[in-house]
UniProtKB/Swiss-Prot annotation:
Record-annotated YcgL domain positions: 14-98
Pfam families registered for this protein in UniProt: YcgL
Start and end residues of each stretch annotated as Disordered: 87-110
Domain of life: Bacteria
Bias (Polar residues): 97-110
InterPro entries referenced in this protein's UniProt entry, alphabetically: YcgL-like_sf (IPR038068), YcgL_dom (IPR027354)
UniProt name for this protein: Protein YcgL
Amino acid sequence: MRQVTIPLIQSKSMFCVIYRSSKRDQTYLYVEKKDDFSRVPEALMKGFGQPQLAMMLPLDGRKKLVNAELEKVKQALSEQGYYLQLPPPPEDLLKQHLSSVGQNTSSADR
């Protein structure tokens, strides 16, 4: 019986390390290497505060990112060395309510 050797193929899967801001709620900083903020602007780091490790994540598409697009994250990491995820804009409940009230009254006038 002849043995067949199958070469191991190492995929160059991109990983990122995600940090939570100590100063800003729902703000996250993605970097390529753990504790390496050398490519992050100093002013951004001051506003971000002490980074708190949230998780390490492969960017191979198996896990969905929350509030971030995978391709934008990959592009930002390769081009500038970091990606900053800001919180989603707050819902304007008053505006939504007034809009729905306005729609209801205009349809009732007909």
